[in-house]
Amino acid sequence: MINEIKKDAQERMKKSLESLAHAFGQIRTGKAHPSILGSVMVPYYGTDTPLSGVANVTVKDSQTLQVVPFERNMLGAIDKAIGSAGLNLNPTNLGELLLIKMAPLTEETRKGFTKQARAAAEDARVAVRNIRRDALGELKKLTKDKEISEDEERRGSAEIDKLIKDFEAQIAKATEEKEKDLMAV
């Protein structure tokens, strides 16, 4: 029973870490990366479709993304969707494909993105702590219902505390790497 609670908590903490990685992927670092366009939705036959569903996004060089639509007639819609996505990107339409130059980040935007990264990391920390609280609550309930002994509860609590320390260290490391990446000129 304790192992099930621990395993469930671990799975949920992994999902929080994956969510953090996804959030970090959405934050521009000054280098071209396809995940920057991950949130762009393109109107496709009356339905908003992710950009990856209507075009290939590749890195042409360290400062340029190349977007090649699967259907040539989608080029205008893709151009408009990227321009209006609030990413501060201006695609260049070359007739068959779009090129997106990454503007160098100013010190001010770097600091803004660093704040964004810290906020995402804090959200992940809060999520992990909430998972810990839920798991410890389940252990207390099992003890109260006399399904496990107090010693087993303490052992389970110690295992969950060790787990949270590991995940908080991973969050701190990921945040530090992202901040270093953002502040590199």
From Swiss-Prot:
Keyword Protein biosynthesis set for record: yes
Q: Which UniProt keywords apply?
A: Cytoplasm, Protein biosynthesis
Q: Where in the cell is it found?
A: Cytoplasm
Spell out the GO cellular component terms annotated for this protein, sorted alphabetically and separated by semicolons: cytosol
Molecular-function GO terms, alphabetical: ribosomal large subunit binding
Gene3D superfamilies with a match to the protein in the record = 3.30.1360.40, Ribosome-recycling factor
Gene Ontology annotations of biological process type: cytoplasmic translational termination
The protein's matches in Pfam families, at most eight in alphabetical order, are given as: RRF
Q: What is its main location?
A: cytoplasm
Q: Which domain of life is it from?
A: Bacteria
Known NCBIfam families for this protein?
Answer: frr
PANTHER family annotated for this entry?
Answer: MITOCHONDRIAL RIBOSOME RECYCLING FACTOR PSEUDO 1, RIBOSOME RECYCLING FACTOR
Q: Which family does it belong to?
A: Belongs to the RRF family.
| Protein task | Responsible for the release of ribosomes from messenger RNA at the termination of protein biosynthesis. May increase the efficiency of translation by recycling ribosomes from one round of translation to another.
**Protein name (record):** Ribosome-recycling factor
Q: Name the source organism.
A: Pseudomonas fluorescens (strain ATCC BAA-477 / NRRL B-23932 / Pf-5)
